[in-house]
Amino acid sequence: MNIRLLAVFALLTGISLPVRAEGDIEWRHRATQGAVTLSANPLGLASRTAFYSARGFAAEAIRPYAQACGFSFGMQNGGTATLSTRLADWRAVGTDGRAVRLRLPAEWDLQWAKAHVPEAARIAFRWAQFQAENVFEAGDWIMGMATLEAPLSGSFRLVARYHDEKGNHEIVLDKLACGHDSSAN
Amino acid sequence: MSPVVGVPPAPTLALPDMDGKIIDLARYRGKLVLVNFWATWCPPCRTEFPSLGRVRKLFKSTEFEVIAVNVGEDMETVFSFAATPAFPVLFDRDALAMARWQIMGLPTTLVVDRQGRLALRAVGGREFDDPVIVAQLRELIRQGRT
């Protein structure tokens, strides 16, 4: 069962099996600013449904999440300064200037509580997400899934804000698009 | 791995192992202990897992131990991934230990020094037998002897 789950997660994250190192992850979108690298892969409905169903979600319960515009994100601190980032400060910006925030893991978890999703499934969900608040020491890196609060049609850019000892910064991923199973997975 | 600011005391950790026996971190006081939080569905966790066994072999068992804390999964799932690990695998089924240890993402690894304090932390995958990390561990063992 674990090999099957790994294969599903590989689909979700875009990695090639076997997984050997973080450098093996094939990211479709990547930006580097100074010592910070931000990466993303679009996620489709079928792969997310399969992954979370295998973790204990009923297909009906996970559907809103699987249908949302979702990505797997990776963020790495290749420098020596401590970085921090809050998902609440990230925005997806459409070509028309419309800005959409990302839905936080805790907001999804409230929905899972109301839907009586089993605790084990909620734990797996919680830790498979890009966490709401992250602190990166030298060499640290984090990956996880996240969804937009509302879909954006066409391409858009993701503006991710982070903080270090010199102040606030932005790193931008261009030309993102919501994933569709026919092309993204 | 990065130094933990203030070197605070390690939170408590007493969880069942793969045989259902409760293993308490306190029993390892006097040893350096590398505590790895992981899950089988987490690709970087799987990648780094073999290096936990390799790094354990580099040190005397009287000086160093590795503990892998699985988050939220059952024994069958873990057993099918790591049937006979060379170190204790503990089960944090409700993720309460993760909360106590203020873990912010998987995998996260902490090194508890011989005085039971949090000395080093790494967020994201590592190869723990990397010479740089091994040197950090050796230095902590050396400091603990003095």
Segments from the language model and where they lie:
Chain A
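Conserved functional micro-motifs across diverse proteins
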Residues: A21-N185
